[in-house]
């Protein structure tokens, strides 16, 4: 971690197989891991090499400002284990995630986990204001899919619309691009362009 003057203020190994990194106003760092970070690679978790347990074995870990682990996704959360953290959205001090293989939407607030089931798979970005939610991405032909809905008190996503992500220059998103959610804003990176869509736009 480097401060505004360029000085290194913290340094640590956060593990292998890092998929997402996001920080909070209080200086916390959330890290989501893909499968190699969960199950081990390059010696991590290898019993033949007496390798250490992967840092990301839980799939989602929070570190403090000194990069010490303060929380990790529990296997008792009730929404399945994280085999690959496909999407991570950090807003304030809370985090939202969507992960393989069941792709529930989960929220971590004050260390408590709540979640909502849905039928989408391959989700690459979660965009939410806490009541509404958009799930962006999918497998194959659904890579530009956008599923919007309401997060109900029954623990499931009440889908309102399924549409496609459209980028400038064409009716549908084509080519290589990256999507990520931050609060109620979807960020799209394509080439040298950085595009933003808020939740109101995704719901129209």
What are these regions (language model features)?
Residues 13-24, 78-88, 118-135, 165-183:
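Repeated scaffold domains used in trafficking and secretory/extracellular systems
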Residues 106-170:
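Intrinsically disordered, low-complexity segments enriched in Gly and acidic/Ser/Thr residues
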Residues 27-39, 87-100, 106, 126-149, ...:
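Short beta-strand elements that form the blades of beta-propeller/WD-repeat-like
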Residues 31-57:
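Short, conserved, GDST-rich strand-edge loop motifs in beta-rich repeat architectures
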Residues 150, 154-204:
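Extended, charged low-complexity segments
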Residues 1, 56-61, 104, 193:
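A short loop-to-beta-strand structural motif that recurs across blades of beta-propeller domains
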Residues 2-6, 64-66, 108-112, 153:
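Short loop/turn segments that connect beta-strands within beta-propeller blades
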Residues 6-13, 69-79, 112-118, 158-168:
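A short beta-strand motif characteristic of beta-propeller blades
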